[in-house]
């Protein structure tokens, strides 16, 4: 009989991840990569729809570009942090912007991690897994 702990482990492998990027090709590539690793995905193409979708879907993790129309990534991070319902969602910034200055600003604004495009697929997946485990009720004690 499954326990609460094993149910939680199983749910992490099917966790819903929200992709926020204005590039449709990148959204599709990330969606395919994440689904191949048993994650569910939803996506938004701008800052305004990102907040609305996060409120509706309650993803377990958000992958966020900084250069977005209708509200840049920093404004999205700020709004997520200001929301009691959304502030605990880990956010991984994935952007074409230079790390110098942007990485520190992103982390200070509440991001969990920062990647410059193109990101290493394996490293990104590793950070996604670690972020989901840290955000789970069981913390880092979950098996990988």
Predicted regions and their residues:
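Active-site beta3 strand of CheY-like receiver
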Residues: 57-63, 68
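Non-catalytic signal-transmission and effector/linker regions of two-component phosphorelay proteins
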Residues: 1-16, 122-144
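Charged docking surfaces used in two-component/phosphorelay signaling
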Residues: 28-36
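Short hydrophobic/Thr-rich beta-strand motif most characteristic of the beta2 strand and flanking loop
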Residues: 38-45, 53
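The feature encodes the CheY-like receiver
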Residues: 27, 69, 87, 99
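Acidic catalytic/metal-coordinating carboxylates
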Residues: 46-49, 60, 72-78
């Amino acid at each position: 009989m499954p326990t609460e702990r094993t149910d939680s482990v199983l749910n992490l492998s099917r966790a819903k991840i929200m992709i926020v990027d204005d590039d449709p090709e990148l959204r599709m590539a990330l969606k395919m990569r994440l689904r191949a690793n048993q994650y569910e995905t939803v996506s938004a193409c701008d800052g305004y729809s990102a907040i609305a979708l996060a409120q509706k879907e309650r993803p377990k993790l958000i992958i966020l570009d900084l250069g977005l129309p209708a509200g840049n990534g920093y404004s999205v991070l700020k709004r997520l942090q200001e929301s009691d319902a959304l502030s605990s969602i880990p956010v991984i910034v994935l952007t074409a912007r230079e790390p110098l200055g942007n990485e520190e600003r992103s982390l200070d604004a509440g991001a969990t991690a920062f990647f410059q495009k193109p990101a290493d697929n394996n490293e990104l997946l590793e950070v996604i897994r670690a972020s989901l485990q840290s955000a789970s009720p069981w913390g880092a004690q979950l098996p990988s």
